[in-house]
């Protein structure tokens, strides 16, 4: 322990034929992504990530996860804004299954740089309020979870269940 590290060396000595076409630039009219706006939204929801005074208890909207309870019901094809507020003293990476998001704003400020792209997880720091927008595509019906992506927080209850109706 504490003495040196092992490093693996890779020697690549063969080239393999590859018929994959990679563009130097995208063809005219190709759209990588488009920004969703508040005008696209058909519904808004609020989520508060917090912790309890009881040791090791993490909550979303004042509740611990229960597989027997659907916390949110979403219409298939809906575009929704989810507002996530972190009232705890530690950061929480908010993650939802089966949907990609765009950050609308963080504490009221528009996203810049890498925050402008599609996300499946968004970091919400202590005291922050982050609004995200996503479209629940037609293939995404069924029950899914949203949760803090820190395993110990998720296991301690910081998770909810949402259902996308067919």
Give the residues covered by each predicted segment.
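Extended terminal and domain-junction accessory segments
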Residues: 1-91, 137-143, 147-166
């Amino acid at each position: 322990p504490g003495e040196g590290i092992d490093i693996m060396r890779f020697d690549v000595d063969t080239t393999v034929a590859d018929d994959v076409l990679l563009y130097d630039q995208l063809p005219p009219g190709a759209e990588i992504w488009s920004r969703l706006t508040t005008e696209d939204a058909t519904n808004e929801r609020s989520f508060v990530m917090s912790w309890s005074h009881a040791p090791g208890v993490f909550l979303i909207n004042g509740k611990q996860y229960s597989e027997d309870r659907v916390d949110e019901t979403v219409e298939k094809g809906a575009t929704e804004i989810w507002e996530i507020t972190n009232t705890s003293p530690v950061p929480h990476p908010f993650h939802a299954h089966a949907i990609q998001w765009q950050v609308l704003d963080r504490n009221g400020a528009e996203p810049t740089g890498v925050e402008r792209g599609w996300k499946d997880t968004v970091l919400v720091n202590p005291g922050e309020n982050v609004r995200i927008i996503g479209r629940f595509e037609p293939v995404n019906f069924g029950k899914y979870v949203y949760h803090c992506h820190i395993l110990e927080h998720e296991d301690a209850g910081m998770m909810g269940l949402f259902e996308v109706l067919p």
